[in-house]
Amino acid sequence: MKFKAPAFLMALALTAPMALAAYADSPALPSAATADQVTTSKLVYGLLSDSRYAYRPRALDAATSKDVFKRYLESLDSSKQFFTQADITRFAPFEANIATAIRGGELEPAFQVFAVYKQRVGERVGYARKLLKTDFDFSTDEKFEYDRKDVPWAASSAELDDLWRKSVKNDWLRLKLAGKQPAEIRKTLDKRYATLEKSVNELKGEDVFQFFLNAYTSAVDPHTDYFTPRTAENFNQAMSLSLEGIGAQLQRQDDMVVIREVIAGGPAAVNGTLKPGDRIVGVGQGKSGPLEDVIGWRIDDVVAKIRGKSDTQVRLEFIPAEEGVDGKHHTLVLTRQKVRLAEQAAKGETLTIPAKDGEPARKVGVIKLPTFYQDFEGRRRNAADYASATRDVAKLLAGFKADKLDGVVLDLRNNGGGSLDEAIELTGLFIEQGPVVQVREPVAASPSTATAAKWSRGMARWPC
């Protein structure tokens, strides 16, 4: 089954593009928003409903409330695998009062809806795991529909049972066709379904608040998102291509956080002790003191403990990869430093296009730019070495110029966006001058135009 669980996967380094997971014995999910979340809800409503701040403010009327409600349900159960029509009917009063909930910060219904979702996930996973103890009949002709976005909600639990029976049967068949044996299939699927339930159980109140508030912001403007403080921190680190930590990418395997990669030049690499596959089981602050057992923790919670200000120390309790999960525990003290995430920066390579049909061979430079990154804080402080996509691309172009290439290709595939200023300035590396983007203010009589000019540092333009 293709699950759509709210999630955010941490690629850490203590870097981290978005994920979802938590303590094995996580505390009960809050039934209401915190005071800060209530205030935030009111502020976000004020910004998105005021023409001074929102380009196209949208009133929180019945139509918008219906849209927000739909988006919130989609963020939880987009494939309609957990809720029944009876659940949706039960939520109807919440849909009617969404405007009051957002304007006044009365967010309890959003948490109540999530509590039902969490309960339904537990029920469905329990049913799926029970099915794994039986045998499937593959002699009958049945159809399982993957794309359930436009189908109606299941009329009953019995209808969901049949959906999940077909889904589990389909999952089993796919593994069987891959050459897996029944015992291995049962083990694989049981773990898969248990992981789904665990990931939902580990969600916190701030996650639920983010899901709901983003249902509202996306209904008003599809390009507007609300970030929790931790998500905002991760975004800023991704844009600045740097972080303060030990310089290691982490991943979660079962209940343990494991070193996936040690980043060159970071404290962990300089120390040389940690290796890919090592399991982190405890974290402490400073040279001495208590160590917190982090087995079963959300990966982003472990990251938060390991990250910290430069020149401060963190202690890690870990099990070397070669010793297995029951191996001896070792302790390591590392001093945090600022680590540059060079692998996420612009990269260039030179390709040779062979001669063909009388045309001579050509040397072409290819620049891959994953994002229009910029260290916003570094630029604000006018730091000499702040991360900038434009600066890095300019250096690559200078190298290409010295090699006397015939042309340059700027590869923006998989580029997720980033700083608008960087996008405009980078364009100035390739054109003499001209409009790049128009920006229309909500109260302006006419749009203003952001214009690219030839970059002011003497870089020659290149065809693309």
Enumerate the predicted regions with their spans.
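Bacterial N-terminal signal peptides that target proteins for export
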Residues: 1-9
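Bacterial N-terminal signal peptides
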Residues: 9-19
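Cleft-lining beta-strand/loop regions that shape enzyme active-site pockets
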Residues: 24-33, 51-61, 65, 198-205, ...
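N-terminal-proximal low-complexity accessory segments that begin disordered
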Residues: 33-76, 87
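Stable alpha-helical elements in mature extracytoplasmic
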Residues: 40, 44, 60, 64-65, ...
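PDZ/PDZ-like domain segments forming the peptide/carboxylate-binding groove
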Residues: 58, 74-75, 96, 110, ...
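Extended, small/polar residue-biased N-terminal targeting/export presequences
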Residues: 60-66, 70-146, 197-252, 313-315, ...
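AAA+ P-loop NTPase catalytic core
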Residues: 152, 156, 161-221, 225, ...
